[in-house]
Structure formats: structure tokens, C-alpha cells
Amino acid sequence: MAPPWLPAVGFTLVPSLGGFLSSRNVLGKGLHWYAGLQKPSWHPPHWTLAPIWGTLYSAMGYGSYMIWKELGGFSEEAVVPLGLYAGQLALNWAWPPLFFGARQMGWALVDLVLTGGVAAATAVAWYQVSPLAARLLYPYLAWLAFAATLNYCVWRDNQGRRGGRRPSE
């Protein structure tokens, strides 16, 4: 039989693992390309992103565990709150390949806006089950708003690099 703490660890780690796997495009050529883009002065330093995302992913992952546990696992009651969560997580994981891999800054922005909407719906659904679990999503929602604003500014300020055009690297 699995130890009782295993589901909590699994739910907490899944978002980070997915985020890590979807961010492979950030490394190498994607990072080189991004370094050459015009960015606003308030752009966060690259080294801050891993700890920020690690914290956000861990909080949302543990929140999903709280919902799962409160609703008795993958029950019929859990379909909406965990389904919304899975949907926003899939949208979240789609952003790095869109932005860094395909270099589609506009579509990446659309993805971020959709992610924010589904994440907000997730927080509302979670609040009905566990206000604490919902509150674990609040920093993520704030970060998504910041990230969407940053994505928009980078997209707007790099007109010649829209549409996935790849400059010489």
C-alpha cells in the first residue's frame, strides 16, 4: 500500500514537472532569441523565473491535492474543480512552446489570457470546496496578469519578430 503522503507529493510535483518539460524551448536557441527582443524596463531578471514558477506550481499543486482529498478523490463532485484545474494547467504548459518554440508572441498572449480566465474559474470552483485551496491560486492569478502584460509589451515592441519569424541565430 502507498504511504499516505504520496498523493500530496504527487499532486504538488506534477505542475512543476509539466512546466519543466514544456519549457525545454526556453533553453538554447529560444533563450538566445528572447535575449535579443526589446523588453520593458520592469521585466524580471531571468534568474527569478525558476523560483517564482516553482513556488506557484507547488502552491497550485498542493491546492489541487486539497480539493481531491476533500471531494474523496476523482469523484463525480471533483469533475468541475479538477477539470478546470487540468484545463488551465494544459493552457499554462502550452505557453512556452508557443512563445519560445514557435515564436508566436500573439498566440502566446491569447493562451495567457485564456489561462487566466480558466485559472480564475478554477479559483471560484475551488472556493466552494476549500477557501484555503482557492487562496493558494491567488498569487498565480496575479502572476498571470503580470505575465500577460509583459507578453503584450514584448509582442507590441517587437513588430518585426511577430508570427514566428526566426531571425538568424
Curated annotation (Swiss-Prot):
InterPro entries: TspO/MBR-related_sf (IPR038330), TspO_MBR (IPR004307). It is a multi-pass membrane protein. This is Translocator protein. Gene3D superfamilies: TspO/MBR protein. GO terms for biological process: lipid transport. Residues 1-5, 68-79, 127-134 are mitochondrial intermembrane. It is found in: Mitochondrion membrane. The chain crosses the membrane at residues 6-26, 47-67, 80-100, 106-126, 135-155. One of its GO terms (cellular component) is mitochondrial membrane. Promotes the transport of cholesterol across mitochondrial membranes and may play a role in lipid metabolism, but its precise physiological role is controversial. It is apparently not required for steroid hormone biosynthesis. Can bind protoporphyrin IX and may play a role in the transport of porphyrins and heme. Was initially identified as peripheral-type benzodiazepine receptor; can also bind isoquinoline carboxamides.
